Swiss-Prot record:
Organism lineage string: Eukaryota, Metazoa, Spiralia, Lophotrochozoa, Mollusca
Other noteworthy facts: Does not show activity on alpha-7/CHRNA7 nAChR.
Its biological purpose: Alpha-conotoxins act on postsynaptic membranes, they bind to the nicotinic acetylcholine receptors (nAChR) and thus inhibit them. This native peptide blocks mammalian nicotinic acetylcholine receptors composed of alpha-3-beta-2/CHRNA3-CHRNB2 and alpha-3-beta-4/CHRNA3-CHRNB4 subunits.
Residues where Sulfotyrosine is found: 54
Location of Cysteine amide modifications: 55
Family per similarity comment: Belongs to the conotoxin A superfamily.
Entry domain remark: The cysteine framework is I (CC-C-C). Alpha4/7 pattern.
Cleaved signal peptide residues: 1-16
Cystine pairings recorded for this chain: 41-47, 42-55
Species this chain originates from: Conus episcopatus (Bishop's cone)
A single GO molecular function term of this UniProt record: toxin activity
Name the UniProt record assigns to this protein: Alpha-conotoxin EpI
A GO CC annotation given for this chain: extracellular region
Region of interest (Ser-Xaa-Pro motif, crucial for potent interaction with nAChR), residue spans: 43-45
Tissue specificity: Expressed by the venom duct.
Length: 56
C-alpha cells in the first residue's frame, strides 16, 4: 500500500513539474504582449499622460 502511495506522489510531482514548465512559456509570451502594448501606449501622448508610471 505504501508503494502505491509513493507511485501516486511521484506521478503527481512529475505532472505538476511538466505543466509548470509549460505555463512558464505562456507567461513569457503574455509579458511580451503586455510590454508591446505599454510601448504603444507610451508613444501616444494622451495615453502617456494618463499612465506616467508605465512610461517613465
Amino acid at each position: 500500500m505504501f508503494t502505491v502511495f509513493l507511485l501516486v506522489v511521484l506521478a503527481t510531482t512529475v505532472v505538476s513539474f511538466t505543466s509548470d514548465r509549460a505555463s512558464d512559456s505562456r507567461k513569457d509570451a503574455a509579458s511580451g504582449l503586455i510590454a508591446l502594448t505599454i510601448k504603444g501606449c507610451c508613444s501616444d501622448p494622451r495615453c502617456n499622460m494618463n499612465n506616467p508610471d508605465y512610461c517613465g
